[in-house]
Amino acid sequence: MTIPSPFAYDGLLYLNGGRGKSLFAIKPGAIGDLTPKEGKTNEFLAWSQERSGTYLPTQVAYDGALYVLSDTGILSRFDAKTGAMSYRSRLEAGGAFTSSPWAYNGRIFCLSEEGKTFVVKAGEKFELLHVNPLDEMAQATPAIVADRLLIRTETRLFSIREKVR
C-alpha cells in the first residue's frame, strides 16, 4: 500500500512506492507504464532507490536534497537530482512517525507520535540539533500558514512563530 503523496520539485516528479519499495524520480513528459524492470532504468526515470520507500510520511525536498522519514524513525537524505544517498540515520530507537517531515531555515523537522520534534541540520551529514517534547501524542503533519506553524496533538493545537525582533 502506498500512502505518501507524489510531488514535483526542481523539474522532477517524486514518487514513493511504499514501505520497503523503491523511491523514484521521474522526468517530465513521461507517459504509460513507467515501471522499470528489476535493476534497470528507462528514458523517463531520472533515478530510483530500492527499499527506500516509506509507509506513511511523504518525503520533503529542501535545498537540493530529498529527506525521507520512515514510520520507524529512520531519516535518509538523497541528492534530489542524482538520488545519491548521503546518510540513513535513526532518530530514536522504538520511535513511531506518522506525520511527514517539514523544512525551514536550514533545518529538517520530524514529529514523532510521542509528540517529540526532532530537529536535524539540513546538509550532507546527519546532525541532530534538538529534541523538543510536546508531551502528548501527535499524528498529524503540521501545517504552515503564513508566518505560523500549526501543530495538532491529541488534545491541543499549538501555533508557533518566530519572535518579532
PLM feature segments, named:
Residues 1-165:
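Noncatalytic, solvent-exposed loop/strand surfaces
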